[in-house]
A protein has these predicted regions:
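Post-HExxH zinc-binding segment in Zn-dependent metallohydrolases
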Residues: 2, 6, 77-121, 172-189
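Long, well-structured alpha-helical subdomains associated
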Residues: 101-144, 148, 153-156
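Juxtacatalytic substrate-recognition/specificity segment
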Residues: 1-80, 133
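Beta/coil-rich, acidic/histidine-enriched accessory regions frequently appended to metallopeptidases
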Residues: 113-117, 125-132, 158-216
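Secretory-pathway/luminal and periplasmic proteins that interact with or process carbohydrate-rich
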Residues: 21-27, 96-101, 163-168
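Active-site recognition of the HExxH zinc-binding catalytic motif
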Residues: 60-73, 86-90, 141, 149
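Second-shell loop/turn segments in exported
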Residues: 45-57, 73-79, 89-90, 124-130, ...
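Soluble non-cytosolic domains of exported or imported proteins
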Residues: 52-61, 79, 83, 128-135, ...
Length: 216
């Protein structure tokens, strides 16, 4: 509530638990454990599907999807980029973890850096591409909160609610354009792979990535 700048949470959120033999479950990709219909205040969850990245427990999944509804309410229904919405939902659902650091570091090592403006389709393609998108979106929001403090999120959402575009709101609150912020973000994370040698063993490479991520 405080993170999003909401004084009133609004109407109760309906949580639908859909069994695997339901039509709604059959129509959703098998790797999706839940989704939100934010404008209607509804979350649809598939309890028979073991939550996987970015959520490792059912409780985290619930918080993640409810987070989408709350972000929608914080902006008064005005749109924010998918990556920001997903990054916030991840931030609301659980703390940042070693696995998240490792995934972002792997994106740097493997040359899979994706511009935030190009991240949208990655959430829909495959489980692997969605996990990649969640990690990058979560990392950027985590970085924003670390640099600007948690009140920055509420200020950005409040400005969007008041009629500002998301880029203008972000600039007004942080003093940086999204392009500048993204460039700085990647610059701060580049050191994580500068000392990784070229190795033939992928297992060894992952061990190095994990060790470096511990110090992030």
């Amino acid at each position: 509530m405080q993170l999003l700048g909401l004084e009133d949470p609004g109407e109760p959120i309906l949580v639908v638990l859909a069994p695997e033999d339901s039509q709604v479950a059959k129509s959703a990709p098998e790797w999706i454990a839940g989704y939100a219909i934010s404008d209607r205040g509804i979350t649809v969850l598939f309890p028979d599907r073991t939550p996987s990245y970015p959520d490792s427990t059912f409780e985290e999944l619930v918080l993640h999807e409810v987070g989408h509804v709350m972000v929608f309410r914080a902006t008064g229904g005005s749109e924010v980029p998918r990556w920001f919405n997903e990054g916030l939902a991840l931030f609301i659902g659980r703390p940042w973890r070693l696995e998240d650091h490792s995934r972002v570091t792997w994106a740097l090592v493997s040359g899979r850096q994706v511009s935030l403006s190009d991240l949208e389709p990655y959430f829909h393609r495959t489980r692997e591409s969605a996990n990649h998108a969640y990690a990058l979106a979560g990392a950027f929001v985590q970085d924003l909160v670390n640099r600007e403090g948690p009140t920055a999120v509420a200020e950005i959402l409040g400005a969007v609610n008041a009629g500002s575009s998301f880029p203008d709101a972000y600039l007004a609150v942080t003093g940086e354009t999204l392009e500048e912020a993204e460039k700085d973000f990647w610059g701060r994370h580049t050191f994580l792979y500068r000392w990784i040698p070229i190795l033939g063993s992928s297992a060894t490479l992952w061990l190095l990535i994990t060790a470096l991520a511990l110090g992030a």
